[in-house]
Amino acid sequence: MAASEKQALMNDTTVVLAAEGLGKQVSSPEGTLAILADVSLSIRRGESVAIIGASGAGKSTLLALLAGLDEPTSGRAVLAGNDLTRLDEDGRAAVRASHVGFVFQSFHLVPSLTAIENVMLPLELARRPDAREAAREVLGRVGLAERVGHYPRQLSGGEQQRVAIARAFVRQPDVLFADEPTGNLDAATGEKIMDLLFGLNRATQTTLVLVTHDRQLAARCDRIIRLEAGRVVPS
């Protein structure tokens, strides 16, 4: 792709997430280790995209770079029109707070807070006066209207992940990053969680970026990006 075409793609307003020549290297006792090399991609608003690959292929590293959780050694990433490589950590955190939601394999709920209080957290940090009302509404959407006052220890694994999903969606993010979101769940519960994620993806047009080792799960996405030894290869 010519440089002018790449620039046009990076400036396309329908593209919510883009990378150009992303690379990540780390030092090791054996020398410099390349975790990612020359990764370029674009993801449009409302798409669901799976990032797949073997363990150690660089999936979670790519997610961290695209979300601004880590800095690349080379290349750049643009999220919702913001060039992350030109921002410091505070600037990247501000972009994440405004445009991104996260769901991980571990639920990362605050054990001393109820379901509704966990979901309210990002809204309270943003000083939203309607935090409780908005949290209650999104908990209803994920099927937990009757569990808003329960603590994480009183919820099943699937219910805890639903709370995490509600927290991720409550600020209506442009992009939801999900890193092995069913990894701690049994197969039946995991399928229900993914039904919920894909349903919210379609209903809200929030872009879903899913890191998974499960090819059947990846096949449910609009598109698959496969990594092999830190490089994008045909899927």
Give a label for each model feature.
Residues 1-25, 233-235:
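ABC-family P-loop ATPase nucleotide-binding domain
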